[in-house]
Amino acid sequence: MKKMKHISLYVAVLLLCGCDFLNRSPYDSVDTSQGFQTVADAEAAVNAAYQPLQWAKLYNMRIWTLDIMAGNSEVGAGGGTDGEETVDLANFIADADNFAALDLWRGPSPGILRCNFVLQKVPAMDIDEAIKNRILGEAYFLRAHYYFILVRLFGGVPLQTEPADSDSDLLLPRASVDEIYELIESDLEEAISRLPKRSEYAQANMGRATKEAAMAELARVYMTYHQDYEHYQEVVTLCDAIGEMGYRLEEDYADLWNPAKQNGVESIFEVQYYGKTNYDFWSNENQASWLSTFTGPRNSGMAAGCYGWNQPTAEFVRQYETGDVRKEKTIFYTGCPTFDGMTYSSAYSTTGYNVRKFLLTKTQSPDYNTSNQNWVVTRYADVLLMKAEALNEMGQTTLAEAPLYEVRCRAGLTNRSSIEGLSQMQMREKIIHERRMELAFEGHRWFDMIRYKDNYALEFLHSIGKTAASSKHLLLPIPTQEREANPKLTQNPGW
């Protein structure tokens, strides 16, 4: 693991636009040299644990580029060496020196250490028990989330559950995948028992982790790791409970990424962004979302500073069914409606397509580095599709129709007979298809592919021409720099 300075005397606090609990200067800090005593101290510490979610190493770039590995899109961008580390990953020719893999390894680590700090310090504090429970619940949720990212990308990783008092405390061997998932599940169960529901939060705290967020995360963990009847039943129970807590689908699919409607009725957990000027993108101080900037059509003038990354492939676009309104709300294609009277040209892209769903107008985001557009990590449509999948895998295929239809109906696919009377295998294929289209470019497709049964990931990748992909590529390599810093780290098979 990267040698990092431990959190001891000062805890940096990230505060983000869109939720008051994070809407302050990024350099507020907690001086623990005089003791860790007040609610403000505890809240500042847990706020700091959210910060790495914002970074380019995670949701501001690397997580969504996993869709490129998954074959939904190509890098695009400026060509040449622009994004070559992502190109190498997507073409399955990367090695252990790959910079994108290094980012993904390093991204969650500071968050884990900050959660450990909270979990060590807060239990002994003499503060209101409800607030204490909520703060501990947030830390448990976030630690589980960071480890869930790591274990799906790399397999076993060092299991750090205490604050690091020296660099040597970080030089741990890799724990087993089973050990990592045991911690993830335990942490999420703690989070569920401690966190408030979203309806119990004041507006000033909107955007914090909630009971529902932890429940949805646990359902996803079960879908990934266990895949047995007992846990599929638990997934259905969790998803039903979330549905009873007031969540519903947005009427307009496009509203999910409208900054004016963030943390809405469909949203379960979002990475909060604070549109801040004069911050370097690669700096950990950056608080602005670059999602619209990265994915908008390059040189089109449609929005501020578009780079043209993550260009949808023709194979992906062909998967849209006739009448699916998500097509024109997800991608730009020749002849599609745009905004501000502009016309889309396939010349803006090497594939002939660009991602539309995240693009902000110049009115919404007049400067490329001032966007407060959140990243939606978990939303209710995902919960409905997990429920449908779990029901089908239990052999309850007819019951899987209703949650699947609810998602498809919002997309304009109102012919329910198209999903009725299917075999379990046919329904499985429908749900896989629906997850791909509904959650396109949101960072889920790669994680879905590697959890599907029957060698799905490699068969799909080979079918679209990514023939260099092999079983070793289902995990990323442990980065060379990390193994040089920590000789206890072993490499993944084949790398």
Describe each region flagged by the PLM.
Residues 84, 88-93, 316-380:
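Flexible, polar/acidic helix-loop-strand segments at domain edges
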